[in-house]
Amino acid sequence: MLQLTSSQLNAVAAFKAFLDGAAQVFVLRGAAGTGKTTLVAEFLRYLAALNRESVLMAPTGRAAYIIAQKTRHAASTIHRAIYSLKVIKSASGADGADTGLHAQFALRSNDDRRNTVYFVDEASMVSDKFNENEAFSFGSGRLLSDLFSYADGRKIVFVGDHAQLPPVDMNFSPALDEDYFRTTFGCTVTGCTLREVMRQSDGSVMLANATRLRQSIEDADYAEFTLASGTDTKRADAGLLDPYYALSADKPCPTAAIITYSNRQALEYNIAVRRYYFGADAPRLLAGDMLMVARNNYAYGHELFNGNIVLVKACENDVMVHNVNVKLDKERSVCVPLRFRKVTIAYRNAEGPVTLDVILLDNFLDDPHGAIDSLTARALRVDFEKRLPSKIKDALPSIRKAITHKAPLTHDQQEIYADYIRLLLHDPFYNALIAKYGYAMTCHKAQGGEWENVFVDMFRYGGTANENYFRWAYTALTRASGRLWHFRSPDYTYISRMTVEPIQRSGNICTSIYAAPGSDFRKARFERIEALASRASLTATDDLSKDYQHRVAFTDADGHRASYILWYKAKGYSDRVQPVSCDSDELRALADTVVADSLAPADVPFACPERPFAEKLAAHIKAILAELDIRLLDITHEHYQDVFHVQASGLAKIGLYYNDKGIYTYMKLASSLGADDAKLEAFRQKFE
């Protein structure tokens, strides 16, 4: 029997309440290893037992295939589920440029039962930002909005990991954001967040690393990045390629993927992998090559989605070259050579294995960019229009003009335009497969997929102590289902980049003394003096009538008296203690000890919830101070600085400076004794 964690049981109860309640949206969030997919399968079985229909979707073909395999429930892409290929509008460019006609595809008619429940897996990838390419767009161009329009009030369950990368060109994941649902769609939202790691995931170093990154993202604290190693996680100090090659001697391993930060890095790895397996003089494409689809394609009877990995079963050596003149404006044009190749590919989708004969755009195989540029896209359209029948070709200028000016098309124009779209949708060259080598890819391309063996090159130009990088790293590391190798990963703690300066002498240190909020530090010190004096069988009185002089007098049981002046400033005491009078050596010794010991309060609290690593460092410093018998007097906060006021061999200050990311950059130390402060020097050496 399936053993559910307590948070999973809570989610099951919340889901059942959702089915009976008024809310339209249920958001199931959870990090890697918390059992989201297990719950989705449980929810689907529960709905089936109720004889209630469910539809399972994912943003990409690979994600749909994975969730279908894991839940044993049919799944499709969101696009396939909600859109038809019926053209509902068109548009055209202006200014004499070859921008072409634009087709928009409508939402399907929804005939599902009103109590149908839709499930969207990998919801962190679902965008609500307007999106279209040179020739096509779907619905309104906003996928999440179109999904709500299609659902038409039916219930939707969004499932995802809120720590993963958001959709491209968005800085958050709208499909996991309850406030976004409420404000944008005006719907009632409920949900649950899974936090417990499932029992079978215990002991996974890979998962432990991901959990630490997720916690940093949730805390918005990026001051520490380090990855532990273990049986399922290895640091590849010499590079990723040797362990990658070790998986398979004679051909690329289909259960492995290399993930990089940039497209250019991915290209370099792809070239290296091909050189190793196929030789330095190998043709650009061979049977056995793996390709990654870089643009959605609907022309071959089966969807090919951005990010799909396909295997080349056969390919022709001959390349067809179409030289295309593309107008840039009314006066300028440029020749764009398009190279095409016939290829047979195989891959798996949610329904099973698929084999297709396609035309491949050979230009893009080793392109260092993530998508074809607008000039190439326009060249594909111009190349298509060169092959049109003269009747359609002659009518295009007037059709473009009418569309540009939003004028209605005549009956003849409508028929010609319908023929144009029909031919465009089935033209093998216009609909050439846009793909590149598929051994290495960026994290955005890998998102939604998983591999048994994942190799992550974690280098990026620019900083790593930020939310974007942590989300990227978390998403990349969680693509592995079995083993992970990482290379060039950051390794820093909140203090590892801190420069520790030599001790400076300060002849006029005024040390802050902690006092509870609302109290006077002078009165707080005298309370400590009274308590210490009482333990030594002394009585104490004080006089604060003179500015900056705290006069304290002690009397013993024999009537002997000793008096002192403790000098202070606005924020605390200096190291100047002036004995005024004493008529007993024994009393003098006791009083000196009381005065010295009274400087340090019993405890100095430190709270900084907005900087969790500051609290961690404060605890670390307190432990070192106690070990070295250095008394902590106060901790104050100044501009980008935490200051620890201490009584070491002399009075001293330890200044810890941090940057706007919460990372400590350097430590400044000052003492009334300078470098001769032995205790403070011992403290300093702890950080070297």
Segments and roles (model prediction):
Residues 330-331, 528-599, 619-687:
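N-terminal accessory interaction module
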Residues 11-19, 23-24, 142-145, 149-154, ...:
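Conserved helicase motor core of P-loop NTPases
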Residues 8, 60, 262, 448:
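Short, conserved phosphate/pyrophosphate- and ester-handling motifs at nucleotide-, phospho-/glycolipid
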Residues 13, 17-18, 24-221:
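ASCE P-loop NTPase helicase motor core
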Residues 5, 61-62, 300, 436:
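Catalytic phosphate/metal-binding cores of nucleic-acid and nucleotide-processing enzymes, i.e., regions
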Residues 1-13:
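N-terminal pre-Walker A segment at the start of P-loop NTPase domains
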Residues 329-338, 343-527, 531-534, 554-561, ...:
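C-terminal accessory regions
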